[in-house]
Amino acid sequence: MFGQWEFDVSPTGGIAVASTEVEHFAGSQHEVDTAEVPSAAWGWSRIDHRTWHIVGLCIFGFLLAMLRGNHVGHVEDWFLITFAAVVLFVLARDLWGRRRGWIR
């Protein structure tokens, strides 16, 4: 019954299994292996922080633009102002941290 199966036998006498060693990438820690992500050769895997800052400012502006609406109560206004302040705080912290070298 088991004669049709072929097993790789290791030098120690047991069946060979997958290695538990981690393969380390030879490049720097910020590079992506082009075998895993082919578009990395064109630079598409890098995060463009300037684009995210512009998107954050657009979100900030959109949240403030929603203050002008057809709602009666001011609870919505406070939520919009709070979320806009949080977005602005995150953007300012990211910009300040990158200029000081705290964030890469």
UniProtKB/Swiss-Prot annotation:
Q: How does it sit in the membrane?
A: Multi-pass membrane protein
- Which controlled-vocabulary keywords does the entry list? Cell membrane, Membrane, Transmembrane, Transmembrane helix
| A cellular component annotation (GO) from this entry | plasma membrane
- TM region(s), chain numbering: 47-67, 72-92
What organism is listed for this UniProt entry?
Mycobacterium tuberculosis (strain CDC 1551 / Oshkosh)
Q: Where is this gene product found?
A: Cell membrane
Designated name of the protein: Uncharacterized protein MT2944.1
Q: Does the keyword Transcription apply?
A: no
Where is coiled-coil annotated?
none
InterPro entries linked: DUF2631
Q: Which Pfam families match?
A: DUF2631
